Regions:
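Acidic/histidine-rich catalytic neighborhood of metal-dependent amide-processing enzymes
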Residues: 1-80, 113, 117
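Active-site-adjacent substrate-binding region
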Residues: 75-166
Length: 166
């Protein structure tokens, strides 16, 4: 795919994994990464979700547009999408990580989108689910973002991985 959705997130995950390995960071809990190529049609993470998974973060993108809070300079944290609301406690945890680590963020609602996290929930996974990512303009068109949004999303992903499970 030529789109930043979702090559940007995959690149940030690979960068995070390299950092964890190179810096020999000890994570407070087991983290599994699942990269899907079917998220856009709702098949993403609807199978093979271990019953040991407690929290499920979809690391995707924040769609920019008229009526949206998201922008291309911050990390976008989703409160609700077309599938319904995301787990409030987990959303609050993400917001608190941003505040504590001085990560610029926006909270948004995406009425026309869903994510791998909502697909896992619909498939019956008993999880706390959340969604965040870099703010990206013109999803699936001539996409663009700002490096500040990439850094904010990377920093929240890193902070989340080092935080305890709620």
């Amino acid at each position: 795919s030529r789109h930043l959705d979702d090559k940007a997130s995959v690149a940030m995950i690979l960068d995070l994994l390299e950092r964890i390995k190179n810096e020999q960071i000890k994570l407070p809990h087991t983290i599994q990464f699942y990269i899907s190529n079917n998220e856009e049609i709702g098949y993403g993470a609807n199978a093979s979700i271990s019953n040991k998974i407690v929290e499920f973060i979809a690391f995707d993108m924040g769609a920019l547009g008229e009526g949206q809070s998201s922008d291309e300079y911050t990390v976008s944290i989703c409160a609700k999408d077309a599938s319904g609301p995301y787990h409030k406690e987990l959303k609050t945890h993400l917001v608190n990580l941003c505040k504590f680590n001085h990560i610029p963020y926006k909270i948004d609602i995406y009425p026309y989108y869903t994510s791998d996290a909502s697909a896992a929930l619909k498939a019956g996974a008993d999880i706390k689910h959340g969604l965040f990512g870099a703010g990206i303009e013109s999803s699936h068109a001539l996409e663009r973002t700002h490096i500040d949004s990439i850094h904010a999303a990377q920093n929240l992903l890193y902070a989340y991985c080092l935080s305890s499970i709620n």
